[in-house]
Every structure is written in structure tokens, then in C-alpha cells.
UniProtKB/Swiss-Prot annotation:
GO molecular function, one term: metal ion binding
Keyword match Membrane: no
EC number in record: 3.4.24.33
Binding-site residues, Zn(2+): H331, H335, H341
The protein's required cofactors: Zn(2+)
Cofactor note: Binds 1 zinc ion per subunit.
A biological process term (GO) from this entry: proteolysis
Species for this entry: Xanthomonas campestris pv. campestris (strain ATCC 33913 / DSM 3586 / NCPPB 528 / LMG 568 / P 25)
Active-site residues from the entry: E332
Name of this protein: Peptidyl-Asp metalloendopeptidase
């Protein structure tokens, strides 16, 4: 409702200004000048910043001075500088992490995309998820559909990166077409006519990052992993899946990557082969249903061990720069639950004819879908004909209902450990 006061007197003007200041968000960061790709070649550039600037998917980048204290439950509004504009992020919720760290979720813009929200209360094209760990902040920001990443550098600074999603690596190596299919027990509680998420399930994930990935990223890898888990959980909420993904354990490995996704994933998965065998002890100790290895391999975004899984095959790999914002971390776990790509890209009907991701023209796509012909943002949603985005159903009952797949396989995968 508009105010009837025009603040015409000096006193009222002062009061209005004070009220505006009180309503303004706390700045999350102060921006510096935009960086050019040529800056990556300078001898003084920090190595992880060099990699950011030389990445094909970097549309632009700038070093920022972060205020990590802004990522706190008490901060209901944050100010972000994006595209030369001051954008307000409105807090949706805050999750506490061990050690006093936190994850801050919010919506961006005036009224924060009210029309676009579904039952989750979050607009996927205008939202932010920020992970605070000490003096560092790692986050994914979407504004007007554009993808931004906020990440710490090894020298203590932070960088804000706008990502060109059309220049991200290919989804999978050619071996994807040869992946085995595993028939998972299907509890059948969700049929095409139902929108139920069934009983809730908790899936625990062990994440192992190679030292090569940690060095190449240069930031706080554990926070990046926590961000990937938070994004996965937001996607489950958005699509009424009824899964909570828990980070059972994060650790690193000195295993030397081969540069081949299939080889590295096999060595991660197989027991007693002389490669990373200790991770299986960790998996049992920390009761992790699923294992994911984070690699420094920019050839592709990731690879799962199969379409569907057993307790012995529930392992996947992901390139660190695809894990968040592009949702490859959740995407690969989706494969382990029998989810497939969009039907145009991946027409196989095994194990479920309805088990594909969804693309809506050139406007958007869901987590399991490949890029639209002319490019489109990937929304943090699983295909689901019972949920709409801006009035458009996010799937169909015959070929694009990943939610139904995940709901009907979640109890099985959650019982692997």
C-alpha cells in the first residue's frame, strides 16, 4: 500500500531517509573494477583467479571485498551489486552448520519474484544461496536468469563471476550411452495421477575431492560441497520430492587423476583395487548411501556409474566447476536414482518411460535436461507435471516426470547404508 505522506517537511524527510536506510539491505560485498581475460596472463595474478579468467564459461568477473558477517540469520535483507545495479535479496531461510557457519537462502528483486514461486517460496531465476565459513562466502546467485558465482580465492579475496552457461563443458563423456541399467525396487507410491512425495527419505552422501581439484578451485572446497548439497535440497523442495540430502563426510584424496572420467570413477567405486580403497571404510563409518568424487577434469561435467544403482554401484563423479549453479552434483545423483535426460536427447524408455528431464522451448530446462537448441538456463527443479513455473507445467506424465522416479526410488537408495 502506498504511503499517504509525501515527506514534505525537513523533519519528515529526515524520518523518511532514516526509514529507507533501515529498510535497505546490508551490502554483501563492495565491487572492484571488471577484470579482462588478459589479466590472467599477468605474473601477479593469483593462480585460481587466472583459472577463473581463462575459463571459457567466464562471461565477466570482478574481485570483490566481502562482508562475511552479512551472511547471518539476523540479516533479512542483503544488497548485491549485479550488472551495475543494486539488487536486494530477501531472506527465505537460514540453515546452521557446525562450527557456527551458516547457509543463507533468499529471493532477489522487487517482491522477489512472487509470481514465479511455487510451493517452495523460491524463484529459481531470481535467487541466492550463500554458504558462510569463517571469513569466506561461497554462493550461487541468479538474477533475471543469469548465473553468478561468488567464491573465495586462495589469497583471501573473493571473486564474483558471471557464467555463460552455453560455454559450460559437455554433460558426459561418450561412455554415458554404455552405462549399465539397474532395476531398482520401486515402491510405487506415486502414480501419474498423483502429486504426493510419499514418506520423507534421507540420503547421505560421502564427497571426496582430489587434491588436484582442491588446488585448481583455490577456494574453500568444503564450502563448495556444502553449497552443492544445499542446492540439491532446494531442488528437492522445489519439486516436492521429499528427499533430504545429508553430507555424511567430506574428505580429500591424494589420488592422481588420469584425465579420464570412466577410469577415475571406476577406481573410486571399486573396492580393494589399490586405488582410494580407504574411502569405502569412510563410507561405512559415516553410513553414506552414495559416494561422489570431485575431479579437476574440465572435459565434461560429470559421470554416474549407471542409470539406477545398487549399494555397490552408487558412485558418481563431477567436475568441480559444474557442481554448483549448473546443478551437476544433483544431476549425477539423479542418474543413480534412475532419472534420465530430456527425451529429445535421451529417448531410452528404460527403466521408466516417464523418467526424463524437461525442456520448455528455448526458455528453460530442468536439472536432468540438456541445453535448449538456442541455450537456456537450467532451473533447480526436477521435471514434474504437477508443478508449474510461471503457469507452465514443468513436465508431462508420459515422458517427463523425474519427481515420480525420485520418489519411487528414494527409499531404496536411502537404505544402502
Amino acid at each position: 500500500m502506498k504511503s499517504k505522506s509525501m515527506c514534505t517537511t525537513v523533519g519528515l524527510i529526515a524520518m523518511c531517509l532514516a526509514g529507507s536506510a533501515a529498510a535497505a539491505g546490508k551490502p554483501l560485498y563492495q565491487t572492484g573494477p571488471a577484470l579482462s581475460r588478459s589479466a590472467a596472463a599477468t605474473a601477479t595474478a593469483e593462480p585460481s583467479l587466472q583459472r577463473v579468467l581463462s575459463s571459457p564459461s567466464t562471461a565477466n568477473a570482478q574481485v570483490v571485498q566481502i562482508d562475511a558477517g552479512a551472511v547471518a540469520p539476523a540479516e533479512k535483507l542483503l544488497e548485491l551489486q549485479l550488472d551495475g545495479q543494486t539488487i536486494t535479496a530477501t531472506q527465505a531461510k537460514v540453515d546452521a552448520l557446525e562450527g557456527g557457519d551458516s547457509i543463507w537462502y533468499g529471493n532477489l528483486g522487487p517482491r522477489a519474484g512472487t509470481r514465479a514461486r511455487t510451493l517452495s517460496g523460491v524463484d529459481p531465476l531470481n535467487s541466492a544461496i550463500l554458504v558462510r565459513s569463517g571469513d569466506t562466502v561461497t554462493g550461487t546467485i541468479r538474477y533475471a536468469g543469469k548465473l553468478y558465482r561468488l567464491r573465495p580465492l586462495a589469497d583471501g579475496r573473493h571473486v564474483l563471476v558471471q557464467v555463460d552457461e552455453q560455454r559450460m563443458p559437455q554433460e558426459h563423456p561418450a561412455e554415458y550411452s554404455l552405462l549399465p541399467k539397474f532395476d531398482m525396487p520401486n515402491d510405487g507410491r506415486v502414480t501419474a495421477a498423483q502429486a504426493s512425495s510419499g514418506s520423507p527419505a534421507t540420503i547421505r552422501v560421502l564427497v571426496v575431492a582430489t587434491n588436484q581439484a582442491v588446488t585448481a578451485y583455490g577456494g574453500n572446497m568444503q564450502s563448495l560441497v556444502q553449497l552443492a548439497v544445499a542446492e540439491a535440497n532446494q531442488g528437492y523442495v522445489n519439486s516436492n520430492v521429499g528427499i533430504t540430502l545429508q553430507l555424511a563426510r567430506y574428505e580429500t584424496t591424494s589420488y592422481a587423476e588420469t584425465g579420464n572420467f570412466t577410469t577415475d570413477l571406476q577406481r573410486f567405486r571399486v573396492t580393494n583395487d589399490g586405488y582410494m580403497d580407504s574411502i569405502h571404510t569412510s563410507r561405512n563409518t559415516y553410513t553414506a548411501d552414495v559416494g561422489v568424487i570431485v575431479l579437476n577434469n574440465s572435459s565434461y561435467c560429470g559421470l554416474a556409474s549407471g542409470i539406477g544403482s545398487t549399494a555397490a554401484t552408487a558412485f558418481a563423479s563431477v567436475y568441480w566447476d559444474c557442481a554448483t549453479g549448473y546443478y551437476s552434483f544433483a544431476h549425477e545423483i539423479g542418474h543413480l536414482q534412475s532419472a534420465r535426460h530430456d527425451a529429445a536427447t535421451d529417448p531410452s524408455t528404460s527403466p521408466f518411460a516417464y523418467g526424463h528431464g524437461y525442456r520448455y522451448g528455448n526458455s528453460w530446462r530442468t536439472i536432468m535436461a540438456y541445453a535448449c537448441p538456442s541455450g537456456c538456463p537450467r532451473l533447480n527443479y526436477w521435471s514434474n507435471p504437477n508443478i508449474s513455473y510461471n503457469g507452465v507445467p514443468m513436465g508431462n506424465a508420459s515422458t517427463a516426470d523425474n519427481q515420480r522416479v525420485l520418489v519411487n526410488t528414494k527409499a531404496n537408495i536411502a537404505a544402502f547404508r
